[in-house]
């Protein structure tokens, strides 16, 4: 791992090498959801921040800006990282306006994805996760979730804070401080986890190649 990357990943405030799995094997994004740019968006093989902003965009716009500033601007450059927001159809123009504002604050928005669908389809998909929080009357929630490349929900479980057992499956976008601290740390740990696994696999491949070369020489 390059020294710059090592220093970046080492800045997480808690030193866990792995982010706990809260629940496993969640469903892929339904094909009926259409992205803003009509590109194909999938959860599989991506680290995903998943959110459901709802149809009251004017009221929750600040939450999206919090996400952009505190999370996306830090991690959007990783090719296997993405932000996926699912909201009711009919809000495309408002999201386009928000993306125009984002472009003044961020250099590259290619890993921001907004998907649109019918409210009942969104609620059906949301319920498959069995999250503790429910969607509101606008088919939205201020909470976002971290999914790994295998579509497992990640968070905090069993870590001690002031003598208490911590459980966290989501992050509140209303709180810029929570995104900046807890969520940023957790995304960083998950990215580091995959980088360490990649490095370990590369060492195995190099060792295997070396053995094969020695056998060929004989």
Functional labels for PLM-detected ranges:
Residues 140-218:
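Thiol-/selenol-based redox modules, centered on thioredoxin-like
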Residues 120-140:
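Surface-exposed short loop/turn segments
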Residues 39-67, 81-84:
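Short active-site neighborhood of thiol/selenol oxidoreductases, capturing the structured segment around
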Residues 54-55, 88-89, 119-120, 149-151:
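Solvent-exposed coil/turn segments that connect beta secondary-structure elements
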Residues 44, 78-81, 139-142:
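Extracytoplasmic
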Residues 1-34:
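N-terminal targeting signals for export/organelle localization
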Residues 60-115, 119-125:
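Structural microenvironment flanking redox-active thiols in thiol-disulfide oxidoreductases
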Residues 71-75, 126-129, 133, 187, ...:
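Sec/Tat-exported extracytoplasmic proteins
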């Amino acid at each position: 791992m390059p020294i710059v990357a090592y220093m970046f990943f080492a800045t997480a405030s808690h030193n866990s090498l792995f982010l706990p799995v809260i629940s496993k094997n969640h469903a892929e994004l339904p094909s009926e959801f259409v992205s803003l740019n009509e590109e194909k968006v999938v959860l599989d093989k991506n680290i995903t921040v998943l959110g459901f902003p709802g149809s009251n965009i004017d009221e929750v716009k600040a939450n999206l800006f919090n996400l952009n500033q505190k999370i996306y601007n830090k991690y959007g450059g990783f090719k296997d990282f993405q932000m996926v927001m699912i909201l009711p159809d009919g809000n495309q123009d408002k999201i386009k306006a928000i993306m125009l504002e984002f472009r003044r604050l961020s250099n590259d928005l290619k890993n921001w994805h907004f998907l649109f669908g019918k409210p009942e389809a969104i609620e059906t998909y949301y319920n498959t996760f069995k999250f503790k929080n429910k969607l509101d009357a606008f088919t939205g929630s201020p909470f976002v979730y971290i999914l790994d490349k295998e579509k497992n929900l990640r968070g905090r479980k069993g870590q001690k804070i002031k003598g208490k057992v911590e459980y966290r499956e989501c992050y509140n976008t209303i709180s810029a401080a929570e995104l900046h601290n807890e969520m940023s740390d957790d995304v960083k740990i998950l990215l580091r986890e995959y980088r360490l696994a990649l490095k370990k696999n590369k060492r195995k491949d190099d060792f295997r190649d070396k053995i094969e070369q020695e056998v060929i020489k004989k």
